[in-house]
Amino acid sequence: MAALSRALGPLRTPAPPLWIGLFLVATGSQQSLAQPLPGNTTEATPRSLRASGSLCGPHAKAPYLCEATHEPAAARIRAQVPDTRWSRVGGQRFYSRVLSPLHRGPSGHTEASAQRSHMGKLKEPQPQDHKPGLGAS
């Protein structure tokens, strides 16, 4: 236990060792982690990022450790990319379906039916109003 806490000591900044220690004790995986842990962390103590990377590689028992250290950038990118892609794809699909039949209309019957439904129910301006907000956010 002393070796485990000493090995987790340098990783104080990226991930709280007390929380990880409690997590390991609660899961009972402290024994399986105690052997690879001290070697990895004492070798890579100055580069705590790399140490946590090697930590979450071999055993999937400590996913939180690598999440806490080198996940933020990837998580930020992963959180942004689907968001922008969805809004861009959804916004453009919305735009091409709602506006282009009304404005140019590649095929005549779609333009006529779209205009008729637009004049009849006045439901089309609502998606049009939603579209800029969708694309912007």
From Swiss-Prot:
Keyword Magnesium applies? no
Signal peptide coordinates? 1-34
- Source organism: Homo sapiens
Which GO cellular component does the record give, naming just one?
Answer: extracellular region
Comp. bias regions, Basic and acidic residues = 121-137
Glycan-linked positions: 40
Specify the protein name. Answer: Putative uncharacterized protein UNQ9165/PRO28630
Please give the chief subcellular localization of this protein: secreted
Q: Where is the composition biased (Polar residues)?
A: 33-45
Give the UniProt subcellular location, in the record's own words: Secreted
Q: Where is this region: Disordered?
A: 33-54, 98-137
Alphabetically sorted, this entry's keywords are:
Glycoprotein, Secreted, Signal
Name residues in a coiled coil: none
Domain of life the protein comes from: Eukaryota
